Curated annotation (Swiss-Prot):
The lineage of its organism: Eukaryota, Metazoa, Ecdysozoa, Arthropoda, Hexapoda. Substrate binds at S138. This is Fat body protein 2. The active site is at Y151 (proton acceptor). The keyword Oxidoreductase applies. Belongs to the short-chain dehydrogenases/reductases (SDR) family. Keywords: Oxidoreductase. Gene3D superfamilies: NAD(P)-binding Rossmann-like Domain (3.40.50.720). GO terms for cellular component: cytoplasm. The gene is Fbp2. NAD(+) binds at residues 10-34. One of its GO terms (molecular function) is nutrient reservoir activity. InterPro entries: ADH_Ceratitis-type (IPR002426), NAD(P)-bd_dom_sf (IPR036291), SDR_fam (IPR002347). PANTHER family: 15-HYDROXYPROSTAGLANDIN DEHYDROGENASE [NAD(+)], ALCOHOL DEHYDROGENASE-RELATED.
Amino acid sequence: MFDWTGKNVVYVGSFSGIGWQMMMQLMQKDIKMMGIMHRMENVEMMKKLQAINPSVKVVFMQMNLMGKMSIDQAMKKMGQMMGHIDVMINGEGVLLDKDVETTMGMNLTGMIHSTMMAMPYMDKTQMGMGGMVVNMSSVYGLEPAHAFAVYAAAMHGILGFTRSMGDKMIYQKTGVMFMAMCPGLTNSEMMMNLRDNVTWHHSESMVEAIESAKRQMPEEAAMQMIHAMEMMKNGSMWIVNMGQLKEVMPTMHWQM
C-alpha cells in the first residue's frame, strides 16, 4: 500500500470534476504539500481545500497547458518550491472536438509536456525520490467514440504514453511509476452541451445514448481512483465506472 505521509502532491487540472474531488480526498491524508496548477486560480476553492486540513501547505501555480514555455516555467517553480514531487496527477480534460488543436493540446500534448517537465523533480537519479504519475484518460481511450473522434484520439494517446512510460526499465532507473485512469460517464461540466461539441453532425444516436445513460458521481470515482493508486501497480490502467473499479488487462498484438 502507498504511504501518503509527508508526500508532495501536484495536481494539474481544473477546480471541478473527478480530479478536484481527488484533491479534496487527498487533503484528508497526512500529506505535506498540495500544489494546484491551472490557467486560472479559484480563490474560494483554494480556501475550501485548505480548510480541510490546515496542516497541509496548499499552493497555486498558474500554468497554460497550451504553451510549452508556460509549462516549463511553472513546473520549475513548483518543483523548486517543493524540493521534489512525489505524486503528480494530470487531471485536465476538455471535450471540444470542433477545436482539434485545443482538444489535443489540453488533453494530450500538454499532459506529456507537464509530465516530462516534472520528471527531474521525481526521478531518483536527478532531484527526485521516485514517485507516481497518474494520468486521466477515459473509457473512450479504450473504445472508439464516433461522436467524439478527436477526444477519443487524445484519450487513446494518453494510454499509449502512460503504458510506455510505465515500462519496467524506466521504473527501475527512475523510481517513478505510471498509472492511467479511465472513468466512465460521470456528472461533470464536460458532460454539458454535448451536442455542441461533437466531431460532426452524424452523431445523434451516440449523443442521445450518452444523455440518457446513468452516470457516476465525481466523488465516488475519485475514491476508487485513490484506491487504485494505493495498489502501486506500475503501467496499469483502471476503469472506474458507476463507482466500481476494474483493472484493464491489455491484449498484446505485436512483440519485437
